[in-house]
Amino acid sequence: MADILIVVDMQNDFIDGALGTKEAVAIVPYVKGLIENFPGKVLFTRDTHLENYMDTQEGKNLPVKHCIRGTEGWQIRQELDALRKTEAIDKVTFGASNLVKVLEAEERIDSITFCGLCTDICVISNVMLTKAFFPEIPLIVDAAGCAGVTPQSHENALQAMKVCQVKVINE
């Protein structure tokens, strides 16, 4: 069986930094357990911006500097990063376009499970990107291992993914 877990953007700035929430802090132990007990390969994405972030389209719409390469906020949460066995997939947009190449290199994939932050931005973006390129692979979102910008937007994102034939578990 070739199952993959994708841990999306579990970075300090999204947990308790510039864009942190109490919901994000609360899922860290759950995500740690998920990683420790996952029977397959675990991949991590990492939101990565440069000093010119505020000049980018995203920066103009979300004018909060975050996940600037090399900063403490950019780092994957220490207790999760300690479990990482592969290079993090750095991404400069909500969806990791380079994730497709990483997944294409896998010999066999039976399912892909997602967890992480933020449900309503980067999790849903990466789930839908993966769904577009790998429509026959079952995709799963572990809702207990996700948090959104707000609880309502988290729920909205979960519902949107369900409509797109993504299995949502542990709501």
Regions found by a protein language model. Give the residues of each.
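Histidine-anchored nucleotide/phosphate-binding helix
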Residues: 31-37, 124-134
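Internal catalytic-core helix/loop-beta-alpha segment
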Residues: 70-121
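Short, charged, surface-exposed secondary-structure boundary motifs
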Residues: 98-100, 149-153
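Active-site glycine- and acidic-residue-rich loops that bind
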Residues: 22-25, 120, 148-150
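Active-site beta-loop-alpha junctions enriched in small/polar residues
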Residues: 47, 94, 144-146
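Short catalytic/ligand-binding loop motif for oxyanion handling, primarily in non-cytosolic enzymes
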Residues: 51-54, 122-123, 149
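Active-site acidic carboxylates
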Residues: 1-88, 140, 155-162, 167-170
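A short glycine-rich beta-strand->turn/loop micro-motif centered on a GG-aromatic cluster
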Residues: 113-117, 136-151, 171
